[in-house]
């Protein structure tokens, strides 16, 4: 039996995550208090059906150690994955404003504005976020995008191997919050300054050929490969579910896309479970 624990900021998409898990055959329980989690799992441990539980700010224990200890205990006997969903403050505020719903902290008596509630919740959840196997930033994701991302990540975990996620991004759009490692490639030769290459992306052959002829590009790619290859066994022993590697250039169109694609394809050839995403390209 697999157990998925879904947590995160209110308005970040926990209900969407549960619907996806339900579609994938999971038995889903919404807003289960942490102190009942072990008892609940024990009651259904002989079931062949996978289980997903969402944890809400309203029923989290005041002491983060309780969640940490509960998860550590469950992981000794079950296949447990913790998913944490988050989004930028302004996006969460926008979502609540559009739906005109009350924030959970307002419902339990906190005397604060919506903006203060969002900030307070993130502060409370910071310790819980550290327990997550997978952190997803839903700021720019539609319900469909989030559903597809979750479906891909969850199905990618079926073999119980560590999933390597390579994602390109543009620094001008902000740092990805779900990355374990971030590599800055803005110092590499920029195809943007070649008029014929400017409208293309790092997935196009002319751009790939342009970058591949520069020694520093190949050297950096090989050094990142070597770094990850060296430390991958230790990361796998640490019971991680995902390793997210983000590669950033200025706009997220050329250099980061090329390096990300090359790294992803390299580790696929090594037999690893790999997912490749290009965040800036997904915006258009």
From Swiss-Prot:
Instruction: Give one Pfam family, short name only.
Output: PapZ_C
Entry binding sites for GTP: 56-59
Residue sites binding ATP per the record: 8-15
GO MF terms here are: ATP binding; GTP binding
Q: Which Gene3D superfamilies does the UniProt record give?
A: P-loop containing nucleotide triphosphate hydrolases
**Top-level lineage group:** Bacteria
Q: Which UniProt keywords apply?
A: ATP-binding, GTP-binding, Nucleotide-binding
Query: Would the keyword Nucleus be found if you checked this record's keyword annotation?
Result: no
As given in the record, the signal peptide range reads none
The record's function comment reads: Displays ATPase and GTPase activities.
| HAMAP family named among the record's database cross-references | RapZ_like
Q: Which family does it belong to?
A: Belongs to the RapZ-like family.
Q: Which NCBIfam families match?
A: PRK05416.1
Q: PANTHER family recorded for this chain?
A: RNASE ADAPTER PROTEIN RAPZ
Please give the name of this protein: Nucleotide-binding protein VF_0384
Q: What is the organism field in this record?
A: Aliivibrio fischeri (strain ATCC 700601 / ES114) (Vibrio fischeri)
């Amino acid at each position: 039996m697999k157990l998925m624990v879904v947590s995160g900021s209110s308005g970040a998409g926990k209900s969407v995550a549960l619907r996806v898990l339900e579609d994938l055959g999971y038995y889903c329980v919404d807003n289960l208090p942490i102190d009942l989690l072990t008892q609940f799992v024990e009651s259904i441990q002989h079931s062949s059906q996978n289980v997903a539980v969402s944890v809400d700010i309203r029923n989290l224990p005041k002491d983060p150690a309780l969640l940490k200890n509960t998860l550590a205990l469950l992981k000794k006997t079950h296949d447990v994955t913790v998913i944490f969903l988050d989004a930028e403050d302004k996006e969460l505020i926008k979502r609540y404003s559009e739906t005109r719903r009350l924030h959970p902290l307002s419902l339990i008596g906190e005397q604060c504005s919506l903006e203060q509630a969002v900030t307070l919740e993130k502060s409370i959840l910071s310790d819980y976020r550290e327990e997550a196997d997978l952190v997803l930033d839903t700021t720019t994701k539609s319900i469909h995008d989030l559903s597809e991302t979750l479906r891909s990540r969850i199905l990618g975990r079926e073999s119980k191997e560590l999933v390597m996620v390579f994602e390109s991004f543009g620094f001008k759009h902000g740092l990805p919050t779900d990355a374990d490692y971030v590599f800055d490639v803005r110092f590499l030769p920029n195809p943007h300054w070649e008029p014929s290459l400017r409208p293309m992306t790092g997935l196009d052959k002319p751009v790939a050929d342009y970058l591949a002829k520069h020694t520093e590009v190949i050297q950096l790619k090989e050094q990142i490969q070597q770094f990850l290859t060296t430390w991958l066994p230790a990361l796998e022993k640490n019971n991680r579910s995902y390793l997210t590697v983000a590669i950033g250039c200025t706009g997220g169109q050329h250099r980061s896309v090329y390096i990300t694609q090359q790294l992803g394809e390299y580790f696929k050839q090594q037999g690893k479970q790999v997912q490749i995403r290009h965040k800036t390209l997904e915006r258009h």
